[in-house]
Every structure is written in structure tokens, then in C-alpha cells.
């Protein structure tokens, strides 16, 4: 046995070295509690710091990843996507005066031919499709057909009825001929079927009554009637030139109004869809009111076919009330100020400009659409309910800094709020986060104090392990 031990000196030396190292580096009873206590204190501080930063990072990622997609979801549900064409609501057919039927001896033209048509012209016209081409020229449609579909108008004037003398072209001072009111009513039934392309709430009849001199043209009813009689009397004389010139002038103003509306729509999309701006609101009602106000400015006439009328200047107040504030936000302060649209000239009572009346329209409320959207949603999870409560608090805070002003004539039961230029945001989620962090820190401090007071510490764990090893 001794011989074997001396034959392997390297192995014994290694065992002796390991034993010495363990004895040298083993903690002494005097300094072991101090070292373990210092090491445990460092671990506790590291754990507390790691826990604190983890909670802050989780809260930030939670708000960034959950709240903003939620806002985009609400925004996309409230407004149509950019680039999509605006859907026009179908206008209900208007009640028109019946046109006289064709003579009994004349057969009615079969469908698909080029005979005279007795219908409501453009309002009840069939959809664009296969239409017969008469004489090699496509049949005009829309507003252009108001002065070309003369088959029905030619029957309004019987050949036996003597026509009133027309106004000579060289005598401008002579008054135009007066026509009976019955024929004007039949002419009214014809022009009430045609509306503008963009400002589709205005008929040609409304424009002829209230705006009879567009671009210095004479578009009075007597002038149009006299020109129509001349066309009917001599079929080869040409088209209804006076009517065509007036319709073209109205169409130019309508296109100009549509260009201004497109510019306004572009501004709303630029500032309300960008990430660096805070406002997320329903702009559908704002656009509808702005369109109505814009058309009332370009066509200062009274709309004839309305159930109730309001002054057209009321549209301007609706735009100022419904359109949002276009103001930046830095996520710390909500800025207050004037609205993005301000009405001017409402107090102008000069007799030069007659006050026109427009239809009293019940505008669609954005709150009703939001309520319908919420009712159609699937049941929310706890996390979605938290994000919803956060944005509900944000919208309440926004309405606090930007109070809603009702137009004149409406009584609001809401209490008035004091104007505030700005205020800090402190959402309930951040309050709950601070309480959670304080509770965790209190737990760590309590655990540390229990260890320092002689409770069960980390230094007793190695002793327990040694006792179990000896028993085995």
C-alpha cells in the first residue's frame, strides 16, 4: 500500500493541493456571515433595480404597442381610407309635374330605339350601360342633357298657340316678353330634375330663380323661354344656346367649389392622420357641413324644396363647431386656442345682399357612430378594457381643454368649463404603476429588515445542506 502511494506522487500531490485550497478558501466562522450578508444585500439591490426597470419598460411597451393601434382602429372605423372615392348618397327622386302624354295616333317608341322619352330625365335615368347612339352622336347624360332633351319640352307649346313676340337682339333696352305662368310651371317641372354634380342639393331651377346672371349672362326664365320658342319654331336653327351657356357657367362654379373642397380634405388628412399630431376625431360630419357651407357661398340662392329652412349663414357656425382643432401636441401639454375654422361677416346686415335660406339638415353625430361601433365590437379582454379606459380618460381631458360650443338656438345642459391654456397629463394607468412599484419596494425592504433582525437568513442554508449530507 505504501509502495503504491509512492509510485504515484503526482496524484497524491494533486489531492493534497486541492485539500489545501479548500481549507484556505473556505470561509472562516468569523467572516462568513458578513460576506453572505453583503452578497445578499447586493443581490437584493440588483433585483430591485431590475424589477423597477422591467415594470417601466413593460408599461411603455404596453402603451405604445396597444394604445396606438387601438386609436388607429377607431380612427379607421370612423373615416374612410385616404384615396378612396367619396360615395355619394343617392338623391331621392323629386316630385315633378307630369308631362303631357303623346298623341293617341302616334305610337310610342319601343325600348332601345331613338324615339322620344317621357321620364324624369336625369333623376330617374337608368344606369350607364348600353344606350343607343342616335345619328352617330352619343346621347348626352347628366346635367348636359338639360338643354338637349327637347322632345318633351317641344310638346309644352302647341303650334296653334301664338307665341309672344321675341326680343330683338339689337334693342337691349326693351323689356323681354312675358310668358304665362302655366308654361313657366311646366318649365319648372323640367329643370327640377337636374342637379349639379358636386353641389347636388341645388337644382337648376333653384339657380335660375336666385342666380340668373352667372358670369354676366342673362339666364332669366323669360329669356330662356323666348330662346326655346325660337328653337321650336325653326328646328334647323340649332341648339338651345341660351340654356347651354347658363348651364356651363353653373358647372364652372361647381367645379371650382369641388377644388376648394379637395384642398380642405387634403389639409384634414395631412394634420389629423400624422403621428406627431394628437387629434383623433370623426371628420365625416365636419366634411359634410363644410361642403354644405361651401356650396352656399358659391351659389347664394334659396333652396326651394325643403321641409324647414334656416339662414345659410347657420352652416358657417356648424362648421366652426364641428370641425376639430388642428394643433400640435408633444404628449406632455394639450394646447388651447382658437378653432381651425372661424366665421367672418356674420354681422353684415347690408341691404345689398339678400339673406338666403337653406335646408335645415339633421347632421349625423359622431358620438352616435362611435356608440354603434362599440356595440358591434366583440367582448373585450381585460387588457383591451384597460386601453379603452385610458383613451376614454384622454378624450375627457381633451374636451375639458377644448369645450364644445353649441350653435345659437340650442340649449346645452352641460356645465360650463373654465378656459385653460394647458395642463399636465396623469392617467390612472401611471398612478397604478407607481403604487405597484412602491408595494414591491416595500416588500424588498421588509425582507431585508427581517434578515438583519436575526430571522432566517441566507447564511443558514449552507449549514442545513451540510447537516443533510452528514446524515446521509
UniProtKB/Swiss-Prot annotation:
Glycans are attached at residues 120, 193. Residues 77-114 are annotated as: Disordered. It is a multi-pass membrane protein. Residues 90-110 have a biased composition (Pro residues). GO terms for cellular component: plasma membrane. It comes from the Eukaryota. Signal peptide: none annotated. InterPro entries: NALCN_aux_factor_1/2 (IPR055288). The chain crosses the membrane at residues 47-67, 433-453. Its main location: membrane. The keyword Transmembrane helix applies. It is found in: Membrane. The keyword Transmembrane helix applies. GO terms for biological process: calcium ion import across plasma membrane. Keywords: Glycoprotein, Membrane, Transmembrane, Transmembrane helix. PANTHER family: NALCN CHANNEL AUXILIARY FACTOR 2, TRANSMEMBRANE PROTEIN FAM155. Belongs to the NALF family. Probable component of the NALCN channel complex, a channel that regulates the resting membrane potential and controls neuronal excitability. This is NALCN channel auxiliary factor 2. It comes from Homo sapiens.
